[in-house]
C-alpha cells in the first residue's frame, strides 16, 4: 500500500463597521470565494501555520496565480525548504527540490473537476451555516469574515476572510472539533494583476535533476459502480460515515506501480479518502514514524499531521488506508465499518 500525506505569525486585526448580509447572501459570498481563483490573478506572500501534537510548523511562500489554473508556490521559509517550489498547470503539479536535485510530477484531474467542486458546494450549504462577521483588514485590504458552523455539532470548523472587491480568500483558519486551532493561512501582502511573466510557470526539469514518480490519480468519476468494477478486486465501502459525509467520487489511481482504488468523501469542508488495494506491500509513511493501535482484532498504524490523520490496516488480503481531517477515534469507527 502506498500513499502520501500532503501538508502546507499572527497579525493584528482592525475591525470596521459593516452591515451583515442576509443568510442567502452569506452562501453566495462563500460560493464566490470558491470560484474566485478561476477568474482572478494575483501575486502575493502567504504565511501558514499548522499545529501538530507537539509543536507548530510555519512556512512562508510567494504565490503567483494566473487565472484560471496556473499557480506557482515558492518557499521563502523555513530555511530547510527555502527555494523549493511547485507549479500547478491545470491538473498537473511539478515539484522542484533544488537541494536534493529532485523533481516530482503528479497528476490529479479531480483538482479541476467541476463535478467535485459543485458537489462540495452543495454539501457545504447542507452541512454548514455561513455566519458573516465584521469586516477586517488583511494585507491592507478590507475583507469580510465568514464562519462556517457545522449544523450537526454547532461547532465552528472554519473561518474565512474574503476580499470585499475580488472575493479571493485572503486568510483562512480551520479548527478541531474541540474548537482549538488546527491551522491558519494568511496573506501578508497581495497584488492583483494578470501581468505575470510566462517563465514563472515554466515546468522544464533542470538539467541533472532526478525525476521521481509522483502520484497519478485517475479522473474522479461519479459513476461509482463502474469504478468499483474496474478495480480488479472486490472493493468495500464503509457502512458508517460521520454526519454530513457523502461519497463524491471514485477513481483508480497508480503510484509507484501499485494500483489503488480511491473513494473520496466530503462534508463540504472536510474530506476523507479511503484507499484500497490487493497488493502485498508495506505502507509508505513518507519518513514519518507511525504509532500503533488496535481495533476489532486488527493491528493498525497511524500518523497525525495537524488536523490530518492517516490510518492503515490489512484485512482479508486487502490493504486499506484512511486519510482525512478527522481524529483517530472517528477514523477507527469508520475502519470498523469497512467489512470485506
Task: Report the location of each language-model feature.
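Extended beta-strand-rich segments in extracellular/periplasmic secretory proteins, especially
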Residues: 118-175, 207-262
